[in-house]
Curated annotation (Swiss-Prot):
Name of the gene encoding the protein in the UniProt record: ftsZ
Reported function: Essential cell division protein that forms a contractile ring structure (Z ring) at the future cell division site. The regulation of the ring assembly controls the timing and the location of cell division. One of the functions of the FtsZ ring is to recruit other cell division proteins to the septum to produce a new cell wall between the dividing cells. Binds GTP and shows GTPase activity.
Alphabetical list of SUPFAM superfamilies matching this protein: Tubulin C-terminal domain-like (SSF55307), Tubulin nucleotide-binding domain-like (SSF52490)
Compositionally skewed regions (Basic and acidic residues) per UniProt: 404-416
Residues involved in GTP binding: G20, G21, G22, V23, N24, G107, T108, G109, E138, R142, D186
NCBIfam families: ftsZ
The UniProt record lists the keyword Nucleotidyltransferase: no
Keyword Cell division carried by entry: yes
Subunit structure: Homodimer. Polymerizes to form a dynamic ring structure in a strictly GTP-dependent manner. Interacts directly with several other division proteins.
GO CC, alphabetical: cell division site; cytoplasm
Protein name: Cell division protein FtsZ
Stretch list, region Disordered: 319-416
InterPro entries: Cell_div_FtsZ, Cell_div_FtsZ_CS, FtsZ/CetZ, FtsZ_C, Tub_FtsZ_C, Tubulin/FtsZ-like_C, Tubulin/FtsZ_2-layer-sand-dom, Tubulin/FtsZ_GTPase_sf
Subcellular localization, as worded in the UniProt entry: Cytoplasm
Amino acid sequence: MDSSTPQNYLAVIKVVGIGGGGVNAVNRMIEEGLRGVEFIAINTDAQALLMSDADVKLDVGRELTRGLGAGANPDVGRQAAEDHEEEIQEVLKGADMVFVTAGEGGGTGTGGAPVVARIARSLGALTIGVVTRPFTFEGRRRSNQAENGIETLRDEVDTLIVIPNDRLLSISDRNVSMLDAFKSADQVLLSGVSGITDLITTPGLINLDFADVKSVMQGAGSALMGIGSAQGEDRAVKAAELAIASPLLEASIDGAHGVLLSIQGGSDLGLFEINEAARLVQEVAHPEANIIFGAVIDDALGDQARVTVIAAGFDSVSQETNANNSSPAQRQAESTRAAFGGDASRPSGLGRSPQRGGNSYGAPAAGFGSRQGQGQDDDIPDDAGFDVDLPAEADAPSSSNTSARKDSLDFPDFLK
């Protein structure tokens, strides 16, 4: 092989967005300039598919639904994907890693994502699902379909990251529009994918590669991920604190047997602060966890430090227990804030209403992670490090606003 073509040695990463929500998420990733991956859009809605800028577009509804969508019926979505199994297999060939992203609860994404994941794994690719759980206001039927879809997908992927959209409301303004809420969900899906691909595609002082990611995520089941950034004194520790204490995921990284840890900063990033950040993460993982560490020097970050934590390999996670009890991760984060000061942990440049549209590599890292519970500590940045157009400090939606009428809401396919 010609040694002048090093790109041939790079891991082949493909991101598949299936259904309206998944295709919207892929479009968002393309807009933000996510690099080093191939984008594939799959849908039963031909019109929505035409609007995608993905490298590969696959209409799986041209016979079964005549390109008109799955009508929020997961059985139709599953059948459509199975009818085009050979085409899906063809576009996934050669991939080392496949991300399957979708908005759970609709038809095409909910029913088709497990089919895509099964095909990807059968081809030998490390297969990671990154999906959203629907907002409560989308209705009980959609919620039930989402839960069934998540459980089915979990059996077909190596690792599954589930992002509950309702948690976005905890960092949203009461006046946020429904369209902006769904765009914010797309941003979180982007964060889930880029947080992993960056570890592989960005050269490091201490390198992480595809084999490192695979050793933690292959057959790992559920995974939790956090991305935090901070500036100023003790920036690496504060970034690590944000990475393990975000309000957006439903469980804690406590007891993880596998952890990927990447710390990025300028050339002045100090050994002591790297050590402190790594120690913070180590203390909340399993005592015998396989912790793989990488450090990237990027002068474009300036005074900013960025920490990415991916935790997987849990013995068992009781979400009810996590929701009601303070975890070691939370207690560690709280003690760190007490030692270093709270408000300083807000990443510089991330105000209450940050601007959308910046490049995901030059902008402060969009982050989400493992803090269960919400609104418990005013020192956590209100936007939790996310580059989304959501002003902070809103109450969670009241359960009294949920009614039978919402169960029958008919959402346009581009929001499914």
